[in-house]
Structures are given as structure tokens and as C-alpha cells.
Amino acid sequence: RPPGFSPFRVD
């Protein structure tokens, strides 16, 4: 996933 997609999951 692109950076900042989720503050908890960035995979």
C-alpha cells in the first residue's frame, strides 16, 4: 500500500 494509506498498516 502507498505510504500514508493507514497510520497503523503500511503494507
From Swiss-Prot:
Tissue: Expressed by the skin glands.
Annotated GO biological process: blood vessel diameter maintenance; defense response; vasodilation
Keyword flag Aminoacyl-tRNA synthetase: no
Keywords: Amphibian defense peptide, G-protein coupled receptor impairing toxin, Secreted, Toxin, Vasoactive, Vasodilator
Domain of life: Eukaryota
Subcellular location: Secreted
Chief location category: secreted
Signal peptide bounds: none
Similarity remark: Belongs to the bradykinin-related peptide family.
Protein name: Bradykinin-like peptide RD-11
Organism the protein comes from: Ascaphus truei (Coastal tailed frog)
